[in-house]
Amino acid sequence: MSNTIFDDVFRTMIEKMPYLAVPLINEVFHTSYPQDVPIVQLRNEHQQENGEIITDSCLKIAGKLYHIECQSVDDTTMAIRMIEYDFYIAIENAQKQGRRYRIDFPKSCVLYLRSGNNTPDFLEIEMVLPDENIVHYQVPTIKLETYTRDSIFEKNLLMLLPFYIMRYEKDIHEMNENPEMFQNLLNEYDEVRTNLEKGLSGTDKAVLYMNLNKLIIKIADYICQNEEKVRKGIGEIMGGKVLELESERLERLRKEAEAEAKEKGEKIGKEIGEKIGKEIGKEI
């Protein structure tokens, strides 16, 4: 299965900014991990006879395995895919206890960027073991459309922001033609930018702010590729103001100090020159 832009953006966040997954894990599994909890990123390539399968993410937090898949469509085979992924993850992390093996399935969930009335809250499989015991395999789903701008920031689910435009996907063309709808969308994104600035105003978070901005614009450009007005409007709001990095701030202050010192030096030099000139004039 080929990657989509949504896969690429999601995996970029998981690989480069894995701490963004922590609030999402807390939301789904009702945990309370702090944002700075140590995270171990496990490999997401698993070999099988007819090639390799690639999962979107596999993280280890506090000794537990977490697996998150990002879906841009409501795939009815997703339950089978998930148990296949989870089985490979469990096997690769199997624990040998004498002649017995223990495999722990990861806590998994699926993030649906697009969903409908038939998208389930849980993916389910009923497994019948050789001894006739029945095991119920259940994976919770997260639906982007159920999260508003306010709830995203309240729960710190910043990982959802790049995909936020997809909540309005069906209305993009109309927004391009309707000034009022278009302005409402711009106001919405102005609030997103403002909230991001407030939450990531520290110099240590400036890089995260800029990276999220880039990903927000990347997905918006893709979704709005045929609607130039909307695409440009979001780009100007999100890309129009970039927080200053600490290194940039120090460089700016250095240049300002040098310019000020030069100006003062020139002024003092001029005053001294004038004074010397007057003294010479008196002697003559």
Task: Please report, for each region that a protein language model flagged, where it lies by residue.
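Coupling/switch segment of ABC-type P-loop NTPase heads
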Residues: 153-180
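Short amphipathic alpha-helical signal-transduction/dimerization elements
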Residues: 86, 90-93, 169, 220-224, ...
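Arginine residue identity/basic-tract feature
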Residues: 11, 43, 81, 99-102, ...
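Accessory alpha/beta interaction modules
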Residues: 1-159
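Short, charged alpha-helical interaction segments and adjacent helix-coil junctions
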Residues: 60-72, 173-284
